[in-house]
Amino acid sequence: MSGRGFLLLALLLLVTVEATRVEKKHSGILLAWSGPRNRFVRIGRRDMQSPLLSERLRFRALGFRQPSSQKQ
């Protein structure tokens, strides 16, 4: 694995661990950043369908249509 790939993997792991920690305290956080595509992503939202509520992370880009059973 190249150095860049290793750093990317380490960063992804760190973000996942931190989001899991935050998820146990809060229902979720909203992140936004600007770039070629302005994106808003909710991280750490609990998946109520999952038996592993505090362990599973849902990454959902806002603006995509949600299934009717998962609307807030």
Swiss-Prot record:
Chain segments annotated as coiled-coil in the UniProt record: none
Cellular component terms per the entry's GO annotation: extracellular region
Keyword Signal: yes
Tissues and organs where the protein is expressed, per its UniProt entry: Expressed by the venom duct.
Region Positively charged region crucial for activity against MRGPRX1 receptors, annotated ranges: 32-39
Location within or outside the cell: Secreted
Positions bearing the site annotation: Key residue for high activating potency against MRGPRX1 receptors: 43
Keywords: Amidation, Cleavage on pair of basic residues, G-protein coupled receptor impairing toxin, Neurotoxin, Secreted, Signal, Toxin
Residue positions, PTM Isoleucine amide: 43
Cited function: This peptide activates human sensory neuron-specific G-protein coupled receptors MRGPRX1, but not mouse receptors (EC(50)=0.54 uM). Compared with the agonist chloroquine (anti-malaria drug), it is 600-fold more potent. In vivo, induces itch sensation, since intradermal cheek injection into humanized transgenic mouse (mouse MRGPRX1 replaced by human MRGPRX1) induces scratching.
Family indicated by similarity: Belongs to the FARP (FMRFamide related peptide) family.
Protein's name in the database: Conorfamide-Tx2
Organism: Conus textile (Cloth-of-gold cone)
Higher taxonomy: Eukaryota, Metazoa, Spiralia, Lophotrochozoa, Mollusca
